[in-house]
């Protein structure tokens, strides 16, 4: 089923795909984004960071893509349940942030966001998706692996920790087929 942006969406945890849609984030979505960011992460991005990113959305190399996942749960009204932030590069996209509200984690929202990201990247002409994930975040790493991302490197002391230290990041990549059907080889 199409979600209005031309991309296919699968059902959400057994619910009709019509209960799910995506939209580009705007400054008017800042409260919802920050609520999710603060609930999902012990060290959330700042409002200033999101303001800067939202003002630089576009389709050129170096621009950002910020997409919101709207969902209508079985009981309740439609609301933003998650989002991703990605940066466009030459034939690549870099996932910078993916967050799902804790009340909607483990319900397939991350996979829907990743599916939408992959569709976006392929529509843009990307051949590879990149991301970094905390070494300690095994749950996220498993979600990324299940989606097809492979670990390719480690960034030492990449993330700050709540205790004031630093934590390594696993670098993961997902190779995408080109319009001609061929796929790059892993690094």
Regions found by a protein language model. Name each.
Residues 101-115, 122-124, 128, 134-142, ...:
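Conserved glycine-rich acetyl-CoA-binding loop
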Residues 2-16, 21-105, 111-116, 120, ...:
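Acetyl-CoA-dependent GNAT
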Residues 2, 7, 130-132, 145, ...:
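Conserved catalytic-core motifs of GNAT/GCN5-like acyltransferases
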